[in-house]
Amino acid sequence: TGEIDYEKTQTDSIDFTGEVTLTLGIKKFDVEKVYRLKVNVHKEEPDLLAWDEMAFAALPSRLGSPLRQKTVEMKGMAVSLIEENDGTYTLATCDNLYADTWKKHQITLPFKPDTGSLAASGTTLWILDDAGNLYTTTDLETFTPAGEKWLSITGTYLDSAIGIREEEGKRYFAQHPVRDMNQCEIPADFPVSGASNFVTLQNKWTSSPVALAACGRKADGKMSDSVWAFDGKEWIILSNGGLPAMEGASLIPYYNYRPSHSGNSMIEYGVWMLLGGRMADGSFNRTIYISYDNGVTWHKGDSKLQLPDILLGNPHFWCK
C-alpha cells in the first residue's frame, strides 16, 4: 500500500502480490495515464525452494558423532539436548539460528533421560526418564519430578504436555498440568510412539487451537498412515490413508498463494509439508508430501520440493 516516487527513492521495492499501478504523466499538459502492472513468472520455476549441498549446519555437540539429539523451542530460543558418544549429555541453546551461535555445556541430570521425549511450550520443558517418569523444568537447571509415569510424550498444547500413560494394562491420554483433555482410553489405531512432531494451527475457522500429529507406530507394532488432531479436549482422525505408513516424519509449515476473489492480487495461505521418516521396511522416506487444507488431504509435492540426489541413503533428519 502507499505510493512510491522513484525520483526520490530509487531503492524502494514493490510487493507484486497485491495490486500495483504505474502512473505516467506530463506536467506541462496536465496529462497522465495509469497502468496496472502484473508480473508473470510462468516461464520460471513456480517454487524456488531447493536443496543445496551447502544448506546444512552441524549439530551443536561438544564431541563428534553424537548418539541422540532433539531440539525444541523454549522462551524464544532453540534448546537442544544431545547424548554424546561417551555417554555424557550436552545442553545447547541458541537465540538466533541464522547466526548459528550456540551456547553449550555439559549437563548432569539426576536421571537417565529419554532424549526423544523432550518437549517444551512457553517457559516450561518436559522430559521422561528411561523408566517413563515425567520431569519438568523452567530454568533448564533444576528438573522437578511431576509424580507421573508416562509411556510417551506426544508434544505440547498451549501450556501443557500431551502424552500417553498406562494404568492396569490399559493406555490413556495424559496431560500435564491437567486442563480440559478427556483422558479416556486411547483407540487401538492411535500411535503410541514414533508420531511426527506435534504442530499447532489456528485460524478464523477454529474456535480453539488445533494440534496435529502424523503417522507413528500403533500399540500392535504396525505403522500408521493417519493424521490425528487434538482441539484441547478430544482427539479425532483428521486423515486416514492419505500418507504412507511410516514413523519419525517431520511436519513443517510452508506457504502457497491463491488469487483473490477480484483477481487483482494474490493471497498467501499456510500449507504443511511432511518429509523424512522411516517406512515399514526400514527404508528412509524420500518423498515430500504437502497438504493445502491443514492435514485433511495430502499430495506428493512438486518435483522442486523433492529431495535431491545428493542426499543419498538415509539422510539424518527424521523425528524420533
Labelled PLM ranges:
Residues T1-G64, T142:
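Beta-rich interaction/scaffold domains
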Residues L49-S61, Q69-T108:
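Beta-propeller domains
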Residues Q69-N85, S117-D130, I153-E168, S208-D220, ...:
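Short beta-strand elements that form the blades of beta-propeller/WD-repeat-like
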Residues R286-T287, Y292-K320:
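Blade-level signature of beta-propeller repeat domains, shared across WD40, Kelch, NHL, RCC1
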